[in-house]
């Protein structure tokens, strides 16, 4: 799947444009 944030599965895009794990 492709998300707007461009992060890998299980990751969330933060306000500063980085990808952080949500687990």
From Swiss-Prot:
Keywords: Cytokine, Disulfide bond. InterPro entries: GBP_PSP. Disulfide bonds join 7-19. One of its GO terms (molecular function) is cytokine activity. Pfam families: GBP_PSP. It comes from the Eukaryota. Hemolymph. One of its GO terms (cellular component) is extracellular space. The keyword NAD does not apply. Causes rapid, rigid paralysis when injected into Lepidopteran larvae. The physiological role may be to reduce hemolymph loss following injury and promote wound healing. Belongs to the GBP/PSP1/paralytic peptide family. This is Paralytic peptide 1.
